[in-house]
Every structure is written in structure tokens, then in C-alpha cells.
Swiss-Prot record:
It comes from Homo sapiens. The gene is CLTA. It is found in: Cytoplasmic vesicle membrane; Membrane, Coated pit; Cytoplasm, Cytoskeleton, Spindle. GO terms for cellular component: clathrin coat; clathrin coat of coated pit; clathrin coat of trans-Golgi network vesicle; clathrin complex; clathrin vesicle coat; clathrin-coated endocytic vesicle; cytoplasmic vesicle; cytosol. This is Clathrin light chain A. InterPro entries: Clathrin_L-chain (IPR000996). Residues 13-25 have a biased composition (Gly residues). Residues 1-92 are annotated as: Disordered.
Amino acid sequence: MAELDPFGAPAGAPGGPALGNGVAGAGEEDPAAAFLAQQESEIAGIENDEAFAILDGGAPGPQPHGEPPGGPDAVDGVMNGEYYQESNGPTDSYAAISQVDRLQSEPESIRKWREEQMERLEALDANSRKQEAEWKEKAIKELEEWYARQDEQLQKTKANNRVADEAFYKQPFADVIGYVTNINHPCYSLEQAAEEAFVNDIDESSPGTEWERVARLCDFNPKSSKQAKDVSRMRSVLISLKQAPLVH
């Protein structure tokens, strides 16, 4: 007679299938199977959430257990962040470098025009420097010629003045006129020149020229100053005596 277990189920025969090693009976639920089914359901939910996040935002969600993108079978260093970004497109630095290269690259016509422009400017600078040197040399030469002409003109003027002086002192009354013309000399004054001229006239006087010599010493230019004395009558008397001297 088969023995009954404490739960009322008949115990198996020796060597037969065991009923208590995790295999559920016909009417009972296995706890281990239920736990495994629950874990599989949670894992499937997590995978579905990641798939929806990729479709919505375009970026993969965090990997479970710290696994890198691409799964545990991905090679180390191949699926890192930077390389993974380059697999989808160029990085920001690469895009900036390529943009600078495109900006720096210019058409052949523009490059040729720039070279011709530089050559033309260099030629203009060289021509300007050459003209400046020529102008300086020409200016120095003209200045030297001007100084030579001035010196020549000065020598001619001195020679003409000597000739004029010799001709002047050969004429009559040259000494008297010379005294009068030299009144601005610091050694002579107007009174001294007039006195010397009067003495010379007395020494060489001739009868009937006294009033003429007196009139020569007078200033007959009218004065317009109010403070000057009225000598118009005296002036008229001297002029009349000069023109018609008294007969002794």
C-alpha cells in the first residue's frame, strides 16, 4: 500500500519521478516558473521602453548593467561615444575644419587677380621711390644753381655800385651831397652834416648865391601837425629871396 505524504499525495516509488524537486503537480503553480516569467516580462517592458525612446528622441537610452552601446558583444574602443558619433556623421571639429578649408579655397581667377594686383602695387611703389629720388636730386641741383645765380648777381651789384659811387663823387658838390646821404651813419647827425655843408659853401661861395645856400638848408615841406608852428610866411620870404636876391 502506498504511503501518503503529509499533504495527502501518494509518495512515489523508489526510482520513480520525484514530485518535490520543482516540478509542479497538475493542479498547483510552480513558484520558480512564476518568478522567471515575471522577470522576463519586466525585461521585455524595459526593452520596449528603450525602443520607444529611440523612435521619439533619436538617442538610445541607458544600457542595463552598464553595458556599452552595441551590446556586450561590441569590441572595446570601437563603439565608444566619439567613434559611435562619427559612424553616424562628422564631428563638430571636423565640420569646422572642412568649412574653413572651403572658405580658404578660392577660384583660380581670384588667386591670379590677387597675384597680379600685388605685382602692380609693387611696381607702383618702386616707381614712386624712383621718382622721389629723381625729384630730390633735381631739387638739390636747382638749389645749387639758384645760389650760384644769387652770388653772381650780388657780385654784379657790388661792381655797379662801385662804378656809380665813382661817377657820383666826380660831379660838383659831391662832398656836400655825400654828407647829406650819410646822415643815417652813426658818426653823423643831421645838424653836423648841415653845418659842414654850410661851411663848405662859405669857403667856395660866390657873390649873389647867399640866399640860395640859405634856402638849401631849409625844409620847405609843409607840416600838417597842429602842434607845429606856422612858418609859412617865413618859408615864402626865403623862397622869394632865393629867386630874387637883394642887390647891395
